[in-house]
């Protein structure tokens, strides 16, 4: 099943969902180099199949703003942007005995505080 998406439009939609504007973007590229933002918009104005199958957009592509970024994610070839923010540093300091929960987690999502905070 094909699921065609325009990369430029999907980028704009994710920005809008997080109250960001295109002017909030500081740079676009990967961890090795950046590309001019205007060039990104031109290249991104293209349809691709975001559904299951092969990956079509560079997996290391990132869009970066002040303390936030968009990164590509993929599962079985299905692709999307994921919005990330630099986390706020907590005031609370806690010495923890382990980073690993005891017993079988059944692949559940386990949080550090779930088995260290009292």
Task: Go through each PLM region and give its residues.
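Acidic interaction surfaces
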Residues: 1-118
């Amino acid at each position: 099943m094909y699921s065609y998406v325009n990369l430029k439009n999907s980028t704009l939609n994710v920005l809008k969902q997080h109250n960001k504007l295109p002017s909030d973007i500081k740079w676009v590229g990967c961890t090795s180099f950046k590309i001019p933002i205007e060039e990104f918009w031109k290249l991104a104005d293209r349809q691709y199949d975001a559904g299951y199958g092969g990956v079509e957009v560079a997996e290391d592509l990132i869009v970066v703003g002040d303390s936030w970024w968009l990164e590509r994610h993929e599962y079985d070839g299905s692709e999307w942007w994921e919005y990330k923010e630099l986390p706020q540093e907590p005031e609370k300091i806690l010495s923890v005995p382990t980073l690993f929960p005891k017993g079988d987690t059944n692949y559940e999502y386990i949080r550090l505080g779930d088995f260290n905070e009292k």
